[in-house]
Amino acid sequence: MQKAVVMDEQAIRRALTRIAHEIIERNKGIDGCVLVGIKTRGIYLARRLAERIEQIEGTSVPVGELDITLYRDDLTMKTEDHEPLVKGTNVPFPVSEQKVILVDDVLFTGRTVRAAMDAVMDLGRPARIQLAVLVDRGHRELPIRADFVGKNVPTSSAEVIVVELAEVDGVDQVSIHEK
């Protein structure tokens, strides 16, 4: 059951614009930067960030797609034959010696990010890995923090954050729901 909308379309747009500026500022431009979205919604957020960065800097940033299914420590079985549902990774550029900016919708326990870092390291040795998230809800189980955060939304363990994006859900909003 939905309790509250914490970000509407305008708030998401503003947060992504701010994150784009922060990425440019922290990296002193975008030379050597690549964006890698964590499937599913992280991909769309990475694409939106790339658009904003291009508008600001006038240069495009490569965007890749990362499927971390086989890297998770809590491998969930999502098909009838109990095999993991693998969606495929598409990172059409080298990550070695690049500043890889992982992009995801929600930072919670840190386990997804840990799995994403393992997946990136299997592709090469980046100069640096940074993390951009739309929402940080706390409750970390691993020592991971985001470099770029759209909004901090403290939650209880009985709540979940639901991110809806137009590309997937037909609407842009972030809301808190009861489990």
UniProtKB/Swiss-Prot annotation:
PRPP-binding, short sequence motif: residues: 100-112
InterPro entries, per database record: PRibTrfase_dom, PRTase-like, PyrR, PyrR_bifunctional
Source organism superkingdom: Bacteria
Keywords: Glycosyltransferase, RNA-binding, Transcription, Transcription regulation, Transcription termination, Transferase
EC number assigned by the record: 2.4.2.9
Catalytic activity, reaction form: UMP + diphosphate = 5-phospho-alpha-D-ribose 1-diphosphate + uracil
GO biological process: DNA-templated transcription termination
GO molecular function: RNA binding; uracil phosphoribosyltransferase activity
One matching Pfam family: Pribosyltran
PANTHER family referenced in this protein's UniProt entry, alphabetically: BIFUNCTIONAL PROTEIN PYRR (PTHR11608:SF0)
Family that this chain belongs to: Belongs to the purine/pyrimidine phosphoribosyltransferase family. PyrR subfamily.
Subunit: Homodimer and homohexamer; in equilibrium.
Function: Regulates transcriptional attenuation of the pyrimidine nucleotide (pyr) operon by binding in a uridine-dependent manner to specific sites on pyr mRNA. This disrupts an antiterminator hairpin in the RNA and favors formation of a downstream transcription terminator, leading to a reduced expression of downstream genes. Also displays a weak uracil phosphoribosyltransferase activity which is not physiologically significant.
Name of the protein in its database record: Bifunctional protein PyrR
Organism ancestry: Bacteria, Bacillati, Bacillota, Bacilli, Bacillales
